[in-house]
């Protein structure tokens, strides 16, 4: 099911004394409609069926609403249009149908020239986002080289009888194989203790570029930047996805699988901005926000900040 933009969630402070320069996100965003000027389009996937199938803690289906509420009161520093394109909702456990609908709506937004920012939902959003982008770009000849940049404690390359939040990048690899496209996947922040030897072997077989969470520290930032830059130099178009469990549990408690180590938000935000500055970003999303597990809206707030860093 696709629902219209939940504009009632966009509420916040209004500073009348400072005038137009004091606008916040809730004063700038407008519901998406066709035939509007190109801008930034927010699209939610209200789904955690993939988390359930992956034996995780459910609740991420409420993530898009919580993320909108956290974004609403942020100061707006952008210039172009900002649209809310509503939510695709997973009903009756039909994850694959929800992913297909999300991919189709994302493709429509790309056709209209928008930068699409996805609001998760479980990390099953990744396959939906990539397939929507790839389907759109494959109409071009030759098809641009798509790079997948994932900030995540997990490779999400599992083999499983059903798709889940643990399988999206294996699904993407299979999509690429069938389409004759290169599988360009870079995963930053991997937790060695949260990924089995089998998953590391799968990553090696697929030529995945990755850095461990313990490598993604401020003292090692030049090496991390070099790794990211080399990846970005080899692609034409970037899809970026950020799983909030890449952050330490102290910064992001509201996820299905909190990280004991993680990568500090300052490092993640710096790299997100660096990737955005490449000029290659077409689609990005944030995944695994679970409001029911959050503390003082800490995870929602940091998610909102990271999403805002893609714009400001």
Curated annotation (Swiss-Prot):
EC identifiers of the protein: 3.5.3.8
Positions bound to Mn(2+) 2: 152, 154, 243, 245
One annotated GO biological process: L-histidine catabolic process to glutamate and formamide
Gene3D superfamilies xref list: Ureohydrolase domain
Associated pathway: Amino-acid degradation; L-histidine degradation into L-glutamate; L-glutamate from N-formimidoyl-L-glutamate (hydrolase route): step 1/1
Family annotation (InterPro entries): HutG (IPR005923), Ureohydrolase (IPR006035), Ureohydrolase_dom_sf (IPR023696)
Residues annotated as binding Mn(2+) 1: 123, 152, 156, 243
GO MF entry, a single one: formimidoylglutamase activity
Reaction it catalyzes: N-formimidoyl-L-glutamate + H2O = formamide + L-glutamate
Cofactor: how and how many bound: Binds 2 manganese ions per subunit.
Domain of life, per lineage: Bacteria
Cofactor(s) required, per the database record: Mn(2+)
Keyword list, A-Z: Histidine metabolism, Hydrolase, Manganese, Metal-binding
Entry-linked HAMAP family: Formimidoylglutam
Family recorded in the similarity comment: Belongs to the arginase family.
Functional summary from the UniProt entry: Catalyzes the conversion of N-formimidoyl-L-glutamate to L-glutamate and formamide.
PANTHER family found in the cross-reference section: ARGINASE/AGMATINASE, FORMIMIDOYLGLUTAMASE
Alphabetical list of NCBIfam families matching this protein: hutG
Protein name, UniProt field: Formimidoylglutamase
Species whose genome carries this gene: Pseudomonas fluorescens (strain ATCC BAA-477 / NRRL B-23932 / Pf-5)
């Amino acid at each position: 099911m696709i629902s219209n933009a939940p504009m009632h969630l966009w509420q916040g402070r209004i500073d009348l004394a400072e005038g137009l320069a004091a606008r916040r996100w809730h004063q700038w965003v407008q519901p998406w409609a066709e035939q509007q000027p190109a801008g930034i389009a927010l699209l939610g996937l209200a789904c955690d069926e993939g988390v359930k199938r992956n034996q995780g803690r459910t609740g991420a289906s409420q993530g898009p609403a919580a993320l909108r509420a956290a974004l609403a009161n942020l100061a707006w520093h952008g210039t172009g249009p900002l649209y809310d394109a509503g939510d695709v909702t997973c009903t009756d456990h039909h994850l694959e149908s929800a992913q297909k609908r999300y991919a189709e709506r994302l493709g429509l937004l790309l056709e209209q020239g928008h930068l699409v920012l996805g609001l998760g939902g479980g990390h099953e959003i990744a396959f939906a986002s990539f397939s929507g982008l790839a389907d759109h770009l494959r109409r071009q000849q030759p098809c641009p080289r798509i790079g997948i940049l994932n900030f995540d404690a997990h490779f999400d390359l599992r083999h499983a009888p059903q798709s889940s939040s643990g399988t999206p990048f294996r699904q993407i690899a299979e999509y690429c194989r069938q389409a004759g496209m290169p599988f360009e996947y870079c995963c930053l922040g991997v937790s060695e203790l949260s990924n089995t030897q089998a998953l590391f072997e799968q990553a090696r077989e697929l030529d995945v570029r990755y850095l461990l969470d313990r490598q993604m520290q401020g003292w090692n930032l030049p090496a991390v930047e070099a790794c990211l830059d080399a990846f970005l130099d080899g692609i034409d178009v970037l899809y970026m996805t950020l799983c909030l469990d890449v952050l330490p549990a102290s910064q992001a408690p509201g996820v299905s699988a909190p990280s004991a180590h993680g990568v500090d938000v300052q490092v993640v935000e710096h790299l997100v901005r660096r990737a955005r500055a490449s000029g290659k970003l077409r689609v990005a999303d944030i995944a695994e926000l679970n409001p029911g597990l959050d503390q003082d809206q800490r995870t929602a707030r940091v998610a909102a900040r990271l999403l805002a860093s893609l714009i400001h």
